[in-house]
């Protein structure tokens, strides 16, 4: 699929990192990360919320195959997705925080709207 960022990692490590970030975002409501990671995480998180809005068994199984914690999938389908029933996309928001002290990478807060 064209347009995906490699984030300086092999595919398996990159997908594991993104799965963990999506799980953390859905669990806590917001995460702090770099801009490029946030853009990739945002795309995948919005797909998970759209699956939650579908609400059928197939959607739940697809979400379980991506999200790393079963309790988070339950929360996604029971609490998060119904909150966005009237919204068509745009479930997340990004705030710039500033550069990271160690390497100067631009940091953002990615949160659910």
Curated annotation (Swiss-Prot):
Part of the 50S ribosomal subunit. Contacts protein L32. SUPFAM superfamilies: Prokaryotic ribosomal protein L17 (SSF64263). One of its GO terms (biological process) is translation. It comes from Clostridium tetani (strain Massachusetts / E88). InterPro entries: Ribosomal_bL17, Ribosomal_bL17_CS, Ribosomal_bL17_sf. Pfam families: Ribosomal_L17. Belongs to the bacterial ribosomal protein bL17 family. The keyword Nucleotide-binding does not apply. Disulfide bonds: none annotated. Keywords: Ribonucleoprotein, Ribosomal protein. One of its GO terms (cellular component) is cytosolic large ribosomal subunit. This is Large ribosomal subunit protein bL17. GO terms for molecular function: structural constituent of ribosome.
């Amino acid at each position: 699929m064209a347009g995906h960022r490699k984030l300086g990692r092999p595919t398996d490590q990159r997908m594991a990192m993104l799965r963990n970030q999506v799980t953390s975002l859905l669990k806590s409501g917001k995460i702090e990360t770099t801009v490029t990671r946030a853009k990739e995480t945002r795309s995948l998180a919005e797909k998970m919320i759209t699956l939650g809005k579908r609400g059928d068994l197939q959607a739940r199984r697809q979400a379980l195959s991506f999200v790393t914690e079963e309790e988070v999938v339950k929360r996604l389908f029971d609490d998060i997705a119904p909150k966005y029933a009237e919204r068509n996309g745009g479930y997340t928001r990004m705030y710039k925080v500033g550069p990271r002290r160690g390497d100067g990478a631009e940091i953002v807060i990615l949160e659910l709207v």
